[in-house]
Amino acid sequence: MTEAWQPNINLLKHTLAKQGIKVHALPAKHEDALPVKNGSLNMITNSHAAFNPKLIKDKLKTGGYFISQQVGALNNYSLSRFFDSDYVPAYPDNTLLKTVADLQNLGFEILLAKESQPSMTFFDIGAIIYYASIIPWEFPDFSVGHCLSQLTQLDQLIQNDSSVTTKEDRFILVTRKM
């Protein structure tokens, strides 16, 4: 099994090692390199990282599974555009439709493909500032000084309405190499 996100690596190593399953930790920029032989993996999981569908196919055994949860292209789009009227999503092609089509074109069987747009609600301006500062791909060039007028508007909305809500964009896939 392969994984790139450290909290998942720790969890998978702890839970799966007891069952004889080897977990391969990948570097952050791994989408074009998996350190295993072609046709050698029973399963590849992916939590939010970019991936190369052809490489996934090459590394999986026939009948192997690819399971991925992704942050879609439109995650927090309205809030990102509020701060930057020229904002364009960093990963505009990361959609369920395109990802499913890419995998089907490579011969994968799609066992599960679901998307969700849950709400995320902010109850104070500090939470918005923190959130925007830790995900620069959705809030490029964000800073309090640069976005002070928008932050003031959002703070007033929170004072009037108790909160500000944005939409997240998520999808999950479970596939099998045929």
Q: Where on the chain are the PLM-derived regions?
A:
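Class I SAM-dependent methyltransferase SAM/SAH-binding core
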Residues: 1-34
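Short alpha-helix immediately C-terminal to the canonical SAM-binding loop
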Residues: 9-10, 53, 76
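Short, glycine-/aromatic-enriched active-site segment of Class I SAM-dependent methyltransferases
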Residues: 71-90
